[in-house]
Amino acid sequence: MXIAVVGAGVTGLAAAARLAAKGHQVTIFEKNEQVGGRMSQFKKDGFTFDMGPTIVMVPDVYKAVFEESGKRFEDYVDMKPLTHIFDIYFSDKDKVSVSTDLAQLSQTLEATEPGSTQGFMQFLTDVYKRYEVARKYFLERTFRKPSEFYNPLTLYRGLKLKTFNNANQLIDNYVSNEKIRKLLAFQTLYIGIDPKQGPSIYSIIPMIEMVHGVHYIKGGMYGLAQGLLQLGQDHGVKVELNADVQEIIIDPKFKRADGLRVNGDIRRFDKVLCTADFPYVAQNLMPVHSPLKNYSPEKVDNMDYSCSAFLIYAGINRQLRDKLHVHNVVFARDFRGNIDDIFSGKMPDDPSLYLYFPSVEDEALAPKDQTGMYVLMPVPELKTGEIDWNDPNMVEKAKDVIYNKLETIEALKDIRQDVVSETVFTPLDFESRYNAKFGSAFGLMPTLTQSNYYRPPNVSRDYKDLYFAGASTHPGAGVPIVLTSAKITAEAMLEDIEHGK
């Protein structure tokens, strides 16, 4: 069958490879000049910068795309484990190093608060059990029909997940030390949600890091996008770049998708898989005569969105290889207040930051004796935000806030004077480059009312031959999760093809 895939992000690339491996003719249409979507990369002044995701968790999910497509992961992607997860900076004189080695981790916990290891390990154990239930019965199912969700067994399993608690409440049940609570809670920001709003199941993120470890891909995260592209091409996938999809063609008589309008031209296909951000699809790509019934433009506007981010990609004329680790987190003095600012629309005065130094691990990504630095500051999305990112003064203020915070770290003292390359990325860039509604960095917020059956579906409930995958669809955001979205959606398509649907 001839299948169109809209979007060459990691979801579209992975799904296309899976479909092509089964013998189908797949064409990907990507509006930008390179593949990768949020997992893009750029080079500037001798530095190589990943633009979006940076942390490799659950490597088995990465490998599965290749192995289930009949290839060896190692032939496409060079990945290795890191012994160190991240450094946490609570203040300029208060740093905690988090290791994948349980003995070292226990020493760190006991140094932070004697006796805390038992509660921490019990947290990991209990959350791992929930993760296994969530993965098998929720994350890896498409919930095509109401009966697949609304049945006694599924609802019982959902209750076992205890999702009515938020992440903060769950963590507090196991850990009393405020620093350790922060260490666990901040990671819900990886998918753009407030830990006091996010269902407790999203506390799986620190568990995954501790149990499965954190890995690094040679050449940066873009190495995965390149590997997926090559995998697809080896199976015959065609990729058209600078190909702006303007409409999904719907046959109103038979209520089915049968093509796309791309750069003004009609292109016919047997099936369409759209991995563009779902809110954008609902509001901009569906024909006027054939909308998505449960996702009117008004409803899409009123849905809950994850936070956005302000990023600085900087080249530093300083060798930091022996002074910093690849992944680092710097906490605001008032972490709770910082979170409240983000989700109430305010620019943080004292932010929490995520710092990524890939050239510490991979010297090829920066000139000799220099270091590439990626800084992410969570900020409000554009609907909630009171921030005018078109104002150059506001951008300068955001930069000042970040550099002032960076300079509280000993290795980054007076860092501004050593910046030799700088690029910023604002919520407006998320909106324009990725068609992300309200500049949301992680798509729709995974609240209880926007999860599982209540999240935009992988199989259209309105039209035949139309499918959706990606961060704003089921099961949610984060690289392992969107790879799962690609998997279950491709499998649903193959099942429909097999049964003549």
UniProtKB/Swiss-Prot annotation:
One of its GO terms (biological process) is carotenoid biosynthetic process. It catalyses: 15-cis-4,4'-diapophytoene + 3 FAD + 3 H(+) = all-trans-4,4'-diaponeurosporene + 3 FADH2. One of its GO terms (molecular function) is 4,4'-diapophytoene desaturase (4,4'-diaponeurosporene-forming). InterPro entries: Amino_oxidase, Carotenoid/retinoid_OxRdtase, FAD/NAD-bd_sf. PANTHER family: PHYTOENE DESATURASE. FAD binds at V5, V6, G7, A8, G9, V10, T11, G12, L13, A14, A15, A16, A17. The keyword Flavoprotein applies. Belongs to the carotenoid/retinoid oxidoreductase family. CrtN subfamily. Its EC number is 1.3.8.-. This is 4,4'-diapophytoene desaturase (4,4'-diaponeurosporene-forming). Keywords: Carotenoid biosynthesis, FAD, Flavoprotein, Oxidoreductase, Virulence. The gene is crtN. Involved in the biosynthesis of the yellow-orange carotenoid staphyloxanthin, which plays a role in the virulence via its protective function against oxidative stress. Catalyzes three successive dehydrogenation reactions that lead to the introduction of three double bonds into 4,4'-diapophytoene (dehydrosqualene), with 4,4'-diapophytofluene and 4,4'-diapo-zeta-carotene as intermediates, and 4,4'-diaponeurosporene (the major deep-yellow pigment in staphylococci strains) as the end product. Pathway: Carotenoid biosynthesis; staphyloxanthin biosynthesis; staphyloxanthin from farnesyl diphosphate: step 2/5. The keyword Oxidoreductase applies. It comes from Staphylococcus haemolyticus (strain JCSC1435).
